[in-house]
Amino acid sequence: MLELYQFEECPYSRQVRLKMSEWEIDYVLRNVSKLKSKRHRLKKISGQTGVPTLVDSGRNVIITGDEKRIITYLHKHYRPQAEQ
């Protein structure tokens, strides 16, 4: 299962959401506070508070605070077969 931790106004999170929608990737959206000091669940899961954060529990992968790395990872593992 893929989970994306983000907040709506974050432009980096938006880039990831748009790419996941474009590639029709199923995921659970987890909204977090804009205030890093209130991102307790995210800190517990990833050890950090940066967004966007992608959690891929099926592959035991967590990528935090780097939209380019997240998109590259999704491209490698989840993009549609027709684009490969």
Where are these regions (language model features)?
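GST-like domain detector, emphasizing the conserved glutathione-binding G-site
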Residues: M1-E8, R14-Q84
